[in-house]
């Protein structure tokens, strides 16, 4: 084949440190817009960014020229600086270590988009921990429940 054709859809999820509710609904769009800009600068295409006060979901078209851990590190580091430098939170903002990432086929993009778009409604009845366990189980990812949000000793 004379050219390279790639379409990889990824769904990233990561939490505020200690799952604190630091992303106010008032600042949410500003923070998500900054994240989208960062993704574009890194040559990825954000499709939707959503979440609630204690975590974020990102659906993107991923450019494999950048390693996933590097993408997440740059996104978290840049967003943390943006939030703290612009005093978008009352307290010092930090992301929790780690993240979850799931891949989806093109046929599932609309469903994942709607899922992320409806995070506020979705979390009226489900915690982030419940949501993440459900996603991990759905993808057959093995995990130790006690370490989902805490560091192994």
Regions found by a protein language model. Give the residues of each.
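Basic nucleic-acid-binding interfaces
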Residues: 1-153
């Amino acid at each position: 084949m004379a050219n390279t054709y790639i379409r990889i859809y990824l769904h990233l999820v990561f939490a505020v440190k200690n799952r604190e509710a630091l992303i106010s609904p008032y600042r949410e769009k500003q923070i998500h817009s900054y994240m989208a800009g960062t993704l574009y600068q890194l040559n990825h295409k954000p499709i939707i960014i959503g979440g609630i006060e204690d975590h974020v979901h990102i659906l993107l078209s991923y450019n494999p020229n950048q390693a996933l851990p590097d993408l997440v590190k740059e996104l978290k580091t840049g967003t943390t600086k943006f939030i703290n430098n612009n005093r978008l939170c009352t307290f010092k903002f930090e992301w929790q270590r780690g993240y979850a990432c799931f891949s989806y086929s093109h046929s599932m993009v609309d469903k994942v988009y709607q899922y992320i778009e409806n995070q506020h409604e979705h979390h009226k009845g489900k915690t982030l921990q419940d949501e993440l366990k459900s996603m991990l189980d759905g993808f057959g990812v093995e995990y130790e429940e006690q370490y989902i949000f805490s560091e192994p000793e």
